Amino acid sequence: MSNIIKQIEQEQMKQDVPAFRPGDSVEVKVWVVEGSKKRLQAFEGVVIAIRNRGLHSAFTVRKISNGEGVERVFQTHSPVIDSIAVKRRGAVRKAKLYYLRERTGKSARIKERLNRVG
């Protein structure tokens, strides 16, 4: 029984999800239905948390919009998500960046992660 469920979940999972970590700035394009119209909406911000649970994986993106902090949780393999693009790599030491909720301005900045050559 368990193998059948795993097989079905594997078929439902997206294969084109880019590798990103907490601290990275990402742009998530989401399909939004307004009345009879369907359009793409971009949500760009910093990944503050990732929850890896196979098909049920999710990640939280935080951005500042008009001086107000906005967080949105996305299901990684949801059909509502059109694309995920990594804009900038961030260097952080924690897996959950919930401390950014209390910070504003320069203290909320994240250093850019530089990849080693070698």
Curated annotation (Swiss-Prot):
<dbReference type="InterPro" id="IPR018257">
    <property type="entry name" value="Ribosomal_bL19_CS"/>
</dbReference>
<dbReference type="InterPro" id="IPR038657">
    <property type="entry name" value="Ribosomal_bL19_sf"/>
</dbReference>
<comment type="function">
    <text>This protein is located at the 30S-50S ribosomal subunit interface and may play a role in the structure and function of the aminoacyl-tRNA binding site.</text>
</comment>
<keyword id="KW-0689">Ribosomal protein</keyword>
<comment type="similarity">
    <text>Belongs to the bacterial ribosomal protein bL19 family.</text>
</comment>
<protein>
    <recommendedName>
        <fullName>Large ribosomal subunit protein bL19</fullName>
    </recommendedName>
</protein>
<keyword id="KW-0687">Ribonucleoprotein</keyword>
<dbReference type="GO" id="GO:0006412">
    <property type="term" value="P:translation"/>
</dbReference>
<dbReference type="InterPro" id="IPR008991">
    <property type="entry name" value="Translation_prot_SH3-like_sf"/>
</dbReference>
<dbReference type="Pfam" id="PF01245">
    <property type="entry name" value="Ribosomal_L19"/>
</dbReference>
<dbReference type="InterPro" id="IPR001857">
    <property type="entry name" value="Ribosomal_bL19"/>
</dbReference>
<dbReference type="GO" id="GO:0003735">
    <property type="term" value="F:structural constituent of ribosome"/>
</dbReference>
<dbReference type="GO" id="GO:0022625">
    <property type="term" value="C:cytosolic large ribosomal subunit"/>
</dbReference>
